[in-house]
Amino acid sequence: MEHTWIFDLDNTLHDSQKKIFPVINHKINIYISELIKIKYIEADKLRQKYWDKYGATLEGLIKHHKVNPSKFLEETHTIENFSELIVPMPGLVKTLSSLKGKKVLYTNGPKNYTNMILKECKIEHFFDGIFSIEDSKFVPKPNEISMELFLDKYQISKAYFVDDIKENLETAKKFGLSTIWITDEVGHPSYIDKKICELSELIKN
């Protein structure tokens, strides 16, 4: 029986923290600052607050400020020199090509952004499905509603779930999935089945 692999995108398949996230966060801060007429530094704090609470800043903006999600994503994820900001994880192509079974991408990122990253990393052909924030009706991980929509769409009951955010994996474990945390953080929560520092460790055992 073939395995099913579920992969997060940002900071799992590519190092978004290094280049592209600072650009996106800056654009979000400007968007928030102009939306609710607050200083940039306060917008930055609010962006982080919503991300910590909901798993995505967008969720907080929808709940508290009635933001149009499609317009928000277009304004904050349309980026010049996009290709220069993408940093694939070491051994990305080799890892994905070596892992046997169905592979599905599950991300809080928007579809166009996701497709562009997969194309830049030359890995789009590895995936049997792509589930973006639009597919979850703009409800992000780790919300259980998002997880239910994802699992129902692809009829998944057993799979390996690879993510850098432990809260997402906690939700995945509630649905019976095997959890793999890619992180350099200390600690090993009980809902984590395997902990790795680099993506390439998936094929080293």
Label each region the model flagged.
Residues 1-3, 97, 110-205:
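Asp-based, Mg2+/Mn2+-dependent phosphohydrolase catalytic module
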Residues 2-90:
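N-terminal helical cap/lid subdomain that shapes the substrate entry/recognition surface
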Residues 11, 105-108, 163:
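Conserved residues at beta->alpha junctions
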Residues 15, 105-107, 181:
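Hydrophobic residues in well-ordered beta-strands that form the structural core
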Residues 71-84, 92-119, 130-133:
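Substrate-recognition element of Asp-dependent hydrolases with the DxDx(T/V) motif
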Residues 88, 106, 139:
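Residue-level marker of regulatory loop/turn positions in helix-turn-helix DNA-binding domains and
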